[in-house]
């Protein structure tokens, strides 16, 4: 398997422990910085769109299979602590600057520097 980050999260949360459990639980705005080689993919994104940020929880514990003292398996949760910490966060798109690759978003739950793997339109 091979995946290349398209950018990274620029947030106020220095660690995963600082971030909210779910993006919908926070009003905080943040940025996604898209690397130059991927900025052509931003064409057509508009403020007020809803996007799903697909990101990698690079500081997550990858040895976890059960949560809450073992009463539930990790695959029944949205926890980033899991064998493959791929995370999805629906966000409100506040602004797009395709020239410098900056997306301003609201509803973030990722730590600063988290690799962003993809952006997808959110479905209602």
From Swiss-Prot:
Highest taxon above the source species: Archaea
Residue span, TsaA-like domain: 3-124
Claim: S-adenosyl-L-methionine is one of the keywords in the record: yes
Keywords (A to Z) from UniProt: S-adenosyl-L-methionine
A Pfam entry, by short name: TrmO_N
Binding positions (S-adenosyl-L-methionine): 20-22, 58-59, 78, 111-114
Protein family: Belongs to the tRNA methyltransferase O family.
Protein name: Probable S-adenosyl-L-methionine-binding protein VNG_1115H
């Amino acid at each position: 398997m091979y995946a290349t980050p398209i950018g990274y999260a620029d947030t106020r949360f220095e660690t995963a422990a600082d971030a909210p459990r779910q993006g919908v639980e926070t009003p905080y705005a943040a940025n996604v910085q898209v690397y130059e080689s991927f900025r052509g993919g931003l064409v057509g994104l508009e403020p007020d769109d809803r996007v799903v940020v697909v990101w990698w929880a690079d500081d997550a514990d990858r040895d976890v299979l059960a949560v809450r003292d073992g009463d539930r398996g990790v695959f029944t949760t949205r926890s980033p602590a899991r064998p493959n910490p791929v995370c999805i966060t629906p966000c409100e798109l506040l602004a797009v600057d395709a020239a410098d690759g900056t997306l301003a978003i609201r509803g973030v739950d990722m730590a600063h520097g988290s690799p962003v793997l993809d952006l997808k339109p959110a479905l209602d």
